[in-house]
Amino acid sequence: MIIDKLYENVEKKGCVCVGLDTDISYLPKGFLNKFTNIEDAIFAFNQRIVDSTFDVSACYKVQIAYYEAMGIKGMILYKKTLEYIRKKGGIVIADIKRGDISATAKMYAKAHFEGDFESDFITLNPYMGMDTLEPYKDYFKNKEKGVFLLLRTSNEGSKDIQYLDLKDNKKVYNKVGEKIENIGKEFLGNCGYSSIGAVVGCTAEENNIRKELKHTFFLIPGYGAQGGKAEVAKSYLSGGNGGIVNSSRGILLAYKKYDEEGKNFEECARNEVINMKKTLQII
């Protein structure tokens, strides 16, 4: 199952997930000026980030909104970025955050697990109900695919709904987590984790969430630019595995710490990933 491959990558390469939420403003001016169009510039930037971090990162997360905003050409760029990572043998998470009734979800599954926009994992929003997950299940069993369901996200507004108190002294996200854990047991890999994972932001601490969701692999956003702390991220791992810690801007813009002109932006990105790995290492 795809979750076994991701688990193995974390064992070999560490728990860092490189986010390719690439905005044109992130590209060094000297690099950008070499190209006649934006799409070619961003693709070349993405390629160099992937090449420089491939042996030190577990996977890549591509946020579709940054590409959708560029129209048709942006979606071609999105397709090329996904293909480039997968052809190298890498694992790619398409951060699409879909969530809809089964008939529509079936089309989302086909769109993002097959054809032009094929990825290994996608992110989904389960707050319409767990029946919205049904059309994806065949892909878990037969197509080596997986999902990460939004559980407790890294944004400040997550408290508006996810943190609401319920009658049994639990919060909404605790109940959603129970459902994710139970449904996921049908799709366990040899590593002991399910192909149905959960998004758990590291901008807030919760001591029991890792203990309660023993078979749920975590996608952990919020590290770095969003203010998430290493100690919190580490608490959501289990022996250094069981999750991946995503950083996007912190890696893509690492060159601004050392090399404002960005002549060696890919080397700076690599060093940032290596530093993240060291910081997140559990001894």
Curated annotation (Swiss-Prot):
Which top EC class applies here? lyase
InterPro entries cross-referenced by the UniProt entry: Aldolase_TIM (IPR013785), OMPdecase_type-2 (IPR011995), OMPdeCOase_dom (IPR001754), RibuloseP-bd_barrel (IPR011060)
Similarity section: Belongs to the OMP decarboxylase family. Type 2 subfamily.
Give GO terms for biological process. 'de novo' pyrimidine nucleobase biosynthetic process; 'de novo' UMP biosynthetic process
The pathway to which it is assigned is: Pyrimidine metabolism; UMP biosynthesis via de novo pathway; UMP from orotate: step 2/2
Active-site residue numbers: 97 (proton donor)
GO MF assignments: orotidine-5'-phosphate decarboxylase activity
What is the organism of origin for this protein? Clostridium botulinum (strain Hall / ATCC 3502 / NCTC 13319 / Type A)
- The EC number(s) this enzyme carries: 4.1.1.23
Catalysed reaction(s) here are: orotidine 5'-phosphate + H(+) = UMP + CO2
Report which superkingdom the organism of origin falls in: Bacteria
The protein's name: Orotidine 5'-phosphate decarboxylase
| Keyword terms of this UniProt record | Decarboxylase, Lyase, Pyrimidine biosynthesis
List the SUPFAM superfamilies: Ribulose-phoshate binding barrel (SSF51366)
